[in-house]
């Protein structure tokens, strides 16, 4: 019984230390995250806004004192082939290649279309919207590496039943630390406007108003 009591006390003490350590790590992480966030970082994100709802949502955000509102269209699609090779074959090959990631090939993709890139994006290879003979897409650089694409690659998509071929004309780096709205795939204007789509929005709200909008 004495030994059991000692063991119980030790276990309780160790458990308390572990919980305390986790709490301290969480607190330090939260402080670091808060310190790293830009002062104008969004504090609220609105997902799956219907296009015909957006004007009302924008008015609500303005009424709640939003000082920054960003909104972009979102089109879902499936990547079906890269340079003529179907993604099922590419995913099978990716099993033995540490540079490739199968999820990037097989998951549902979310595309947006923009005339200009957000300020936290930087083109590092190729040029944005530089090929008038093709429908163009700009890829985030690490995503391009994961799927095995490069400048000049042809990407085939199934956009909710409609086939679409896009040429990669630029690669970008993205500063994800800004918490801005960013995408792996950005398509040039004039290609996806008629596709079924939703809107994604990010806003910076006064702290006391965040709960009301969410």
Q: Model-derived features: where do they sit?
A:
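Alpha-helical transmembrane segments of bacterial inner-membrane membrane proteins
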Residues: 1-214
């Amino acid at each position: 019984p004495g030994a059991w009591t000692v063991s119980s006390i030790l276990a309780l003490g160790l458990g308390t230390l572990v919980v305390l350590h986790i709490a301290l790590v969480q607190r330090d992480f939260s402080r670091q995250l808060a310190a790293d966030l830009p002062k104008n970082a969004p504090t609220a994100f609105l997902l799956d806004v219907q296009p015909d709802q957006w004007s009302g949502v924008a008015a609500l955000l303005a009424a709640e004192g939003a000082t920054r509102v960003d909104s972009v269209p979102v089109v879902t699609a499936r990547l079906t082939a890269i340079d003529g090779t179907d993604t099922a074959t590419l995913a099978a090959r990716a099993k033995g290649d540490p540079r490739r990631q199968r999820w990037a090939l097989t998951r549902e993709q979310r595309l947006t279309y923009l005339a200009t890139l957000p300020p936290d994006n930087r083109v590092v290879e190729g040029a944005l919207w530089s090929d008038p003979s093709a429908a163009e897409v700009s890829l985030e650089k690490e995503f391009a590496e994961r799927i095995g694409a490069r400048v000049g690659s042809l990407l085939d998509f199934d956009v909710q039943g409609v086939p679409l071929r896009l040429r990669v004309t630029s690669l970008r780096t993205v500063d994800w630390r800004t918490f801005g709205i960013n995408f792996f795939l950005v398509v040039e204007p004039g290609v996806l406007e008629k596709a079924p789509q939703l809107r994604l929005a990010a806003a910076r709200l006064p702290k006391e108003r965040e709960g009301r909008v969410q």
